[in-house]
Swiss-Prot record:
The gene is P. GO terms for biological process: DNA replication; symbiont-mediated suppression of host innate immune response. This is Protein P. It comes from the Viruses. Residues 336-679 are annotated as: Polymerase/reverse transcriptase domain (RT). The record marks 63 as: Priming of reverse-transcription by covalently linking the first nucleotide of the (-)DNA. It catalyses: DNA(n) + a 2'-deoxyribonucleoside 5'-triphosphate = DNA(n+1) + diphosphate; Endonucleolytic cleavage to 5'-phosphomonoester. Its EC number is 2.7.7.7, 2.7.7.49, 3.1.26.4. It comes from Hepatitis B virus genotype D (isolate Germany/1-91/1991).
Length: 832
């Protein structure tokens, strides 16, 4: 007869009417009993012949991707002018006095951040924008281009101008000013390590290992520039740097880089001086043929025997006869002035050699599940975390649940700040740019690759015969709709572009590490400035706590002003005031301890409602189920050990079948969640120890010992001794000399014992006692004779490796222990 849920509960000692613990508990360590229970609950039967179930509620296999939904009306989020102050360390020192070594080291790490991949693989431009939405190719192309353009305008990306130069918007940092070049030509490279063979040959060489020795390169670049005492302004030709992309008001000669004429071929004379025969886009297709070369003065290009120059693909339609009702020439003729073919940034900079390629693809998705009106750019630089040359990203401490509770469970009022576009605050050194390239090959190539009717041959690309091969009803309708949104920008966006990251991108494993270092250093500074308050951060989530609401508001004002003075952008609409229970990292943390947030509890209920019984479930779906249940496991009676059968099936990659009893057991576990309470400091006065054959306890001056019926593995014996000590004394601080018991991970013990021990020892804190000093050592060996002196072992709750309370420097801080905020009387009012 299968084991019923009631029997199973009684077996696990979860009911009160169990016999004496010293007899019942060792029985659960018996391997034979564990095997029989596993067979009864159908936990060990992994080889099943029935087809597997691949979907449980919303859970599908871990690797089956949910199809993202394209929204043609996505808004591109705006990025304020994010510019983190370069002298951030100096500003923090003005605020709080000298910084600690830890804070300084973390802030230096991101000023600027550096990225050293082992090998960079360059991909053709066609891979720049991923064809993620086959139904909405053109729409997705323009939306993504617009997003990239917005990022470039906000100073988050560099735009590759030539192999060795890039332009950007926003305020330059000092390391970018060292690398600025002014009116001297881009290719004057007789001296220094940047000299290279001519562009054509170097670009067509294979880019398999083009990692530059960046450390030495940065030094060279800086040294070469030190001799020249140029300021930014002095370096720039008064004529060579007009605001590009703005048509001059006069009707005289045209100073725009891209002229109004249909061919887009001529440059103004002063531009020609600043940029000798250099193409803005030396783009190459994967086969090595030139795709488009814009803005080359025709005489110089031809005289140097370069490839033929093709005029602008978009504007060519103006001079051609419409091929049908859906010809693109109808759209091109809508406007007289389509603006420039390319825009250029406010500042120019020399870069290490940057091929006309990309290193990662981009696509758009919803900003988050609750906000589908705005888009988010997904950047895939996964090449750096895969294969033989993968970069092993630095590890960083994530506070565990107990540390988090010890730290934040208090009677403070809480408020959380939202840092807008947190990743894009941290600047990257320009030498990293050639490794983090995104972009697109231009609309013509994009459409040509993906449309079925285009007969595109390399030798006749850009010529008139196949210009109209692009025309199709779908493209025409899409462009007409997009024209309403983007207007004359359609022309700009239809050109190829290559952009490199100037701030840290989200798709690289280094970025979360750097962000965590940055925000933890800033919070450490804030905590020392306001010693009676608490500031804590995890990634871009920053929380502030204070004793009273009015106190919290003034702290909020002071901290916000401080963060703004550093150049950190906060999103005021998303500041949340939590009262006394803080919502943070998926938990609700109050003075009673922590519990999972409500939406997670609802998800768990939903999961159990849909969970089928007696049907084999695909192990990938089990991974999803364990992911959800594992998050809430610390709040249940039996904790992680209860999920061990599921872990075992995932490890062996077999299907798992829920028996009615096991499902009822889990269901009951997760219906009643107990808060994880904060640990309190105290003195340890109860000690436990064991040998394979016996156990011993010391409770104050009382000592006890006992023997096991059969010898047990030492870790199991130590765990049993700890359980006896807890149930006999009721003390919540125990001393033990066993590291496994100390770790409170009971998943490696026999399954039934692990589940029962987790419930008995829930909320117990352990202190390590070396065996030689453990008062329970003698009783465990059967000797009750001599009593050792009792140790006074203090227990201090841990806050993990979050390096929270940085020691204040010895220099007295010049800020008194209170919040400063400008009184309106002192600031606004003037005596008459």
């Amino acid at each position: 007869m299968p084991l019923s849920y009631q029997h199973f509960r009684r077996l696990l000692l979860l009911d009160d009417e169990a016999g004496p613990l010293e007899e019942e508990l060792p029985r659960l360590a018996d391997e034979d009993l564990n095997r029989r229970v596993a067979e009864d609950l159908n936990l060990g039967n992994l080889n099943v012949s029935i087809p597997w179930t691949h979907k449980v509620g919303n859970f599908t296999g871990l690797y089956s991707s949910t199809v993202p939904v394209f929204n043609p009306y996505w808004k591109t989020p705006s990025f304020p002018n994010i510019h983190l102050h370069q002298d951030i360390i100096k500003k923090c020192e003005q605020f709080v006095g000298p910084l600690t070594v830890n804070e300084k080291r973390r802030l230096q790490l991101i000023m600027p951040a550096r990225f050293y991949p082992k090998v960079t693989k360059y991909l053709p431009l066609d891979k720049g924008i991923k064809p993620y939405y086959p139904e909405h190719l053109v729409n997705h192309y323009f939306q993504t281009r617009h997003y990239l353009h917005t990022l470039w305008k906000a100073g988050i990306l560099y735009k590759r101008e030539t192999t060795h130069s890039a332009s950007f918007c926003g305020s330059p940092y000092s390391w970018e000013q060292e690398l600025q070049h002014g009116a001297e030509s881009f290719h004057q490279q007789s001296s220094g390590i940047l000299s290279r063979p001519p562009v054509g040959s170097s670009l067509q060489s294979k880019h398999s290992k083009s990692r530059l020795g960046l450390q030495s390169q940065q030094g060279h670049l800086a040294r070469r520039q030190q001799g020249r005492s140029w300021s930014i302004r002095a370096r720039i030709h008064p004529t060579a740097r007009r605001p590009f992309g703005v048509e001059p008001s006069g009707s005289g000669h045209n100073t725009n880089l891209a002229s109004k004429s249909a061919s887009c071929l001529y440059q103004s004379p002063d531009r020609k001086a600043a940029y000798p025969a250099v193409s803005t886009f030396e783009k190459h297709s994967s086969s090595g043929h030139a795709v488009e070369l814009h803005n080359l003065p025709p005489n110089s290009a031809r005289s140097q025997g370069e490839r033929p120059v093709f005029p602008c693909w978009w504007l060519q339609f103006r001079n051609s006869k419409p091929c049908s009702d859906y010809c693109l020439s109808h759209i091109v003729n809508l406007l007289e002035d389509w603006g420039p073919c390319a825009e250029h940034g406010e500042h120019h900079i020399r870069t290490p050699r940057t091929p006309a390629r990309v290193t990662g693809g981009v696509f758009l998705v919803d900003k988050n599940p609750h906000n589908t009106a705005e888009s988010r750019l997904v950047v895939d630089f996964s090449q750096f975390s895969r294969g033989n040359y993968r970069v092993s990203w630095p590890k960083f401490a994530v506070p565990n649940l107990q540390s988090l509770t010890n730290l934040l469970s208090s009677n403070l009022s809480w408020l959380s700040l939202d840092v807008s576009a947190a990743f894009y605050h941290l600047p990257l050194h320009p030498a990293a740019m050639p490794h983090l390239l995104v972009g697109s090959s231009g609309l013509s190539r994009y459409v040509a690759r993906l449309s079925s009717n285009s007969r595109i041959f390399n030798h006749q690309r850009g010529t008139m015969q196949n210009l109209h091969d692009y025309c199709s009803r779908n493209l025409y309708v899409s462009l007409l709709l997009l024209y309403k949104t983007f207007g004359r920008k359609l022309h700009l966006y239809s050109h190829p572009i290559i952009l490199g990251f100037r701030k840290i991108p989200m798709g690289v494993g280094l970025s979360p590490f750097l962000l965590a270092q940055f925000t933890s250093a800033i919070c450490s500074v804030v905590r020392r400035a306001f010693p009676h308050c608490l500031a804590f951060s995890y990634m871009d989530d920053v929380v502030l706590g204070a004793k009273s609401v009015s106190h919290l508001e003034s702290l909020f004002t002071a901290v916000t002003n401080f963060l703004l003075s550093l150049g950190i952008h906060l999103n005021p609409n998303k500041t949340k005031r939590w009262g006394y229970s803080l919502n943070f990292m998926g938990y609700v943390i109050g003075c009673y301890g922590s519990l999972p947030q409500d939406h997670i509890i609802q998800k768990i209920k939903e999961c159990f409602r849909k969970l089928p019984v007696n049907r084999p479930i695909d192990w990938k779906v089990c991974q999803r189920i364990v992911g959800l249940l594992g998050f809430a496991a610390p709040f249940t009676q039996c904790g992680y050990p209860a999920l061990m059968p599921l872990y075992a099936c995932i490890q062996s990659r077999q299907a798992f079948t829920f028996s009615p009893t096991y499902k009822a057991f889990l269901c009951q576990q997760y219906l009643n969640l107990y808060p994880v309470a904060r640990q309190r400091p105290g003195l340890c006065q109860v000690f436990a120890d064991a040998t394979p054959t016996g156990w011993g306890l010391v409770m104050g001056h009382q000592r006890m010992r006992g023997t096991f019926l059969a010898p047990l593995p030492i870790h199991t014996a130590e765990l049993l001794a700890a359980c006896f000590a807890r149930s006999r004394s009721g003390a919540n601080i125990l001393g033990t000399d066993n590291s496994v018991v100390l770790s409170r991970k009971y998943t490696s013990f026999p399954w039934l014992l692990g589940c029962a021990a987790n419930w008995i020892l829930r909320g117990t804190s352990f202190v390590y006692v070396p065996s030689a000093l453990n008062p329970a050592d003698d009783p465990s060996r059967g000797r009750l004779g001599l009593s050792r002196p009792l140790l006074r072992l203090p227990f201090r709750p841990t806050t993990g490796r979050t390096s929270l309370y940085a020691d204040s420097p010895s220099v007295p801080s010049h800020l008194p222990d209170r919040v400063h905020f400008a009184s309106p009387l002192h600031v606004a009012w003037r005596p008459p």
